[in-house]
């Protein structure tokens, strides 16, 4: 059950932010979506608040998604288990592997389909404890 999920959306493109927020809010009851526009903001937000999942764009200014994921994983403890899902238009096998090597948990190609997004979120969050 994804109800009430706390999701950090890390994306620098305003249109993509709007689309992702709309999809998440239309699909998940009581979802909480916070936005970070680059990797530096993402790491700061993850340190400041508990999230169930991070949706991470990989190509961003200041700090990309790979480096942000590595920085989050380096925090240790529960941060090593935090689901981080890559969002990228590049679906080449090498790109998917690069995301996994950086410590990401899953992968969603952009532009994403609502069903694909929800299936990925369900599979990643199926073990989360309800508050």
Regions of interest found by a model, annotated:
Residues 1-131:
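C-terminal compact regulatory domains
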């Amino acid at each position: 059950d994804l109800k009430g999920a706390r999701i950090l959306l890390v994306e620098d493109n305003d249109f993509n932010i709007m689309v992702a927020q709309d999809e998440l809010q239309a699909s998940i009851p009581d979802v909480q979506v916070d936005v970070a526009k680059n990797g530096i903001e993402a790491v700061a937000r993850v340190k400041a608040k508990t999230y169930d999942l991070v949706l991470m764009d990989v190509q961003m200014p200041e700090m990309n998604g790979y480096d942000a994921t590595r920085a989050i994983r380096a925090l240790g403890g529960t941060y090593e288990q935090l689901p981080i899902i890559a969002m990228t238009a590049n679906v080449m096998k090498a790109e998917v592997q690069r995301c996994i090597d950086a410590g990401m948990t899953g992968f969603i190609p952009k532009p994403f389909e609502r069903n694909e997004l929800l299936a990925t979120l369900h599979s990643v969050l199926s073990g989360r404890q309800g508050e």
